[in-house]
UniProtKB/Swiss-Prot annotation:
It comes from Oenothera argillicola. It comes from the Eukaryota. Its EC number is 7.1.1.-. NDH shuttles electrons from NAD(P)H:plastoquinone, via FMN and iron-sulfur (Fe-S) centers, to quinones in the photosynthetic chain and possibly in a chloroplast respiratory chain. The immediate electron acceptor for the enzyme in this species is believed to be plastoquinone. Couples the redox reaction to proton translocation, and thus conserves the redox energy in a proton gradient. This is NAD(P)H-quinone oxidoreductase subunit 2 A, chloroplastic. It is found in: Plastid, Chloroplast thylakoid membrane. It is a multi-pass membrane protein. The lineage of its organism: Eukaryota, Viridiplantae, Streptophyta, Embryophyta, Tracheophyta.
Length: 510
């Protein structure tokens, strides 16, 4: 009888332990519901692709778009919930991470309509393209919430592998193959450098991999001001620099922008920077909290080099995509100002606000380039001359997005830069802000040079590409124009919309 009762108690205890062990991942999984929706969408795409024919192509776009929209909805419903650390410290959910995840999902949602007509006209494989985009989005979302060194390494690799495949998607294009090889080789080298930096951080903290535990470990081992931490800081900065592409880690950017399919460039130009910015902010602010006197000057140098080199070299470019590549290098210099300022002076809020506007400005510009490229087959800046005489709507849309990128009032880019520079000035970064103001004026020069070409009416300057310009082969109302309209409207938002956006961004604390 006693043995029977003891046996029942043993079975009951074992059952409780098993249920707790099963309930933990199930409970944690409920907090990554937005990521789970994307995973379900990926599985659904694969299943439909393996059982369908070409007549089901619209379903691929519908499933991809609805997965992204549902993921955004789930993310918004989770807003303002208590921060949680999940999966034994591997992943963290809080407002700060979630707003970056929202920005990545927004980028992907706008990029898919950009790709529809492009894929139809170039006869690219559809399913694989959408799978790579969704998987890269998933990797970016996990990177935003990564809370330990292993996840911070694995998540960007998930994003990067899809990025390599997307950049080389047009296999018969020599420029695309060249861009992919450069991207792959430099990406592999940067990952190795990043892991080496992580190894120094791991050893210095006494074998800790979780970000907050690394800080505690550095305090316990008294290694927070050691040479090992300085070495880790340098290697990690170089590794993250490849993802952000500031100067001098920018060599891959112009070639990848020029050689990759334009919708891919539009996707990579914003999502990679958003995800890398979120990761860089957490890494510099948590494990390197005691080394701020070292990484502040390091990031200031990167910001100055990026703003000066990016904007000066952009003046000399003849390709629109290469010009935007160097422009993006300059733009990331402005974003770094927000990272340096930190949370105390509203730096993170200004950085998030500017990145939101940058998404609309940049994607709007790329939507115009995709549309013009499909109708003319050229990417040369000179071939845009006189576009206003043939397609005023496209010319005006491109002009507004470029002016917003340059930061002219009363467009959104002006207010984004104004808030970013003001936060930097309040934090005492006078020289850095002065360089930012100077390079912004330089960027306005080469943007206005393009706008002047768009509006020219002199026949001797109009190239055959514009003379023979027709709205075909695309439909008059197409998804590219839909994305373009949304981005143009968002790029021209007046300053009255700034206060609620900044208020939301200021709630994104760790």
């Amino acid at each position: 009888m006693i043995w029977h009762v003891q046996n029942e108690n043993l079975i009951l205890d074992s059952t409780i332990i098993f249920m707790k062990a099963f309930h933990l991942p199930l409970f944690d999984g409920s907090f990554i519901f937005p990521e789970g929706i994307l995973i379900f969408g990926l599985i659904l795409l694969l299943m439909i692709d393996s059982t369908s024919d070409q007549t089901d192509i619209p379903w691929f776009y519908f499933i991809s778009s609805i997965s992204l929209v549902m993921s955004i909805t789930a993310l918004l419903f989770r807003w303002r919930e208590e921060p949680r650390i999940l999966f034994s410290g591997n992943f963290q959910t809080n407002n700060f991470n979630e707003i970056f995840q929202f920005l990545i999902l927004l980028c992907s949602t706008l990029c898919i309509p950009l790709s529809v007509e492009y894929i139809e006209c170039t006869e690219m494989a559809i399913t694989e393209f959408l799978l790579f985009v969704l998987t890269a989005t998933l990797g970016g979302m996990f990177l935003c919430g990564a809370n330990d060194l292993i996840t911070i390494f694995v998540a960007p690799e998930c994003f990067s592998l899809c990025s390599y495949l997307l950049s080389g998607y047009t296999k018969k294009d020599v420029r695309s193959n060249e861009a992919t090889m450069k991207y792959l080789l430099m990406g592999g080298a940067s990952s190795s450098i990043l892991v080496h930096g992580f190894s120094w951080l791991y050893g210095s903290s006494g074998g800790e991999i979780e970000l907050q535990e690394i800080v505690n470990g550095l305090i316990n081992t008294q290694m927070y001001n050691s040479p090992g931490i300085s070495i880790a800081l340098i290697f990690i900065t170089v590794g993250i620099g490849f993802k952000l592409s500031p100067a001098p880690s920018h060599q891959w950017t112009p070639d990848v922008y020029e050689g990759s399919p334009t919708p891919v460039v539009a996707f990579l130009s914003v999502t990679s920077k958003v995800a890398a910015s979120a990761s860089a902010t957490r890494i510099f602010d948590i494990p390197f909290y005691f080394s701020s006197n070292e990484w502040h000057p390091l990031l200031e140098i990167l910001a100055i080099l990026s703003m000066i080199l990016g904007n000066l070299i952009a003046i000399t470019q003849t390709s629109m995509k290469r010009m935007l590549a160097y422009s993006s290098i300059g733009q990331i210099g402005y974003v770094i100002i927000g990272i340096i300022v930190g949370d105390a002076n509203g730096g993170y809020a200004s950085m998030i606000t500017y990145m939101l506007f940058y998404i609309s400005m940049n994607l709007g510009t790329f939507a115009c380039i995709v549309l013009f490229g499909l109708r003319t087959g050229t990417d040369n800046i000179r071939d845009y001359a006189g576009l206003y005489t043939k397609d005023p709507f496209l010319a005006l849309s491109l002009a507004l997005c470029l002016l917003s990128l340059g930061g002219l009032p009363p467009l959104a880019g002006f207010f984004g830069k104004l808030h970013l520079f003001w936060c930097g000035w309040q934090a005492g970064l006078y020289f850095l802000v002065s360089i930012g103001l100077f390079t912004s004026v330089v960027s306005i020069y080469y943007y206005l040079k393009i706008i002047k070409l768009l509006m020219t009416g002199r026949k001797q300057e109009i190239t055959p590409h514009v003379r023979n310009y027709r709205r075909s082969p695309l439909r008059s109302n197409n998804s590219i124009e839909l994305s373009m309209i949304v981005c143009v409207i968002a790029s021209t938002i007046p300053g009255i919309s700034m206060n609620p956006i900044i208020a939301i961004a200021q709630d994104t604390l760790f």
